[in-house]
Amino acid sequence: MKILILGATGRTGKQFAQLAAASNHQVSAIVRNKGKASLADVNYVEGSLADETLLNELMTGIDAVVVALNINRTSDNPFAKIVSPLTLISDSVKTLIPVMEQHGVKRLITVSASGVGDSWNNMPLVARLLIRNSNIWRAYEDHDRQEQVVRHSQLDWTIVRPVMLTEKDQDTYTAVIGNPRGGSISRKGVAKFILDTLGSGKYIRECVTLSR
């Protein structure tokens, strides 16, 4: 399978790129800085996610696109300074989707977060208070905008909403259509779910919550 990744140098995107390449898929990725590109078996192309010409060039022959973008902060501290444009995720999918449609590429998987959109009230109160009163909220706002854009497309999309992400060396996951409370999942588990779902054809036009 030929896969294009947006967000391949982020922690979740990198896990997916590594797993997909190790599984003998042809993986390409648009990155802002090739200096952050560290996987030998991935075709990194330096450029802007807003560059339609570049997207058109890379989309030829692609079977699926995975979006693992986020609104970045200077650290994991919830109150750390934001260093990404506040609409990076939603603007990127707004540019991406028409290019996919033009090339007849139907399969899209986007990584969002548990608590986004209609799953907000299912989060524990403490988590909601932290998110709403910190800079994490800016990412949640843009993930929500991304989800709305994706849902209104004609693509075969799957929205992935992981619960709290960890760096554990585990690739197990539990996928549900619904909103479980709490829990955690490793980034490797998210990557494994995405690759499994691309191979199975399941969860078309569905929003899936992931936990361990």
Name what the model sees in each region.
Residues L6, I30, A68-L69, L108-S114, ...:
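SDR active-site strand-loop-helix element
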Residues G35-T95, V99-Q102, K202:
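NAD(P)H-binding glycine-rich loop region in Rossmannoid oxidoreductase-like domains
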Residues E147-K168:
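Conserved beta-loop-beta element that borders a ligand/cofactor-binding pocket
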Residues K34, A80, D91-R138, H152:
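Conserved Rossmann-fold NAD(P)-dependent oxidoreductase catalytic core, especially the SDR/UDP-sugar
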Residues I3-S23:
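N-terminal Rossmann NAD(P)H-binding glycine-rich loop of SDR-like oxidoreductase domains
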Residues W120, S153, D169-Y173, T197-E206:
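Glycine/proline-rich active-site loop of Rossmann-fold NAD(P)-dependent oxidoreductases
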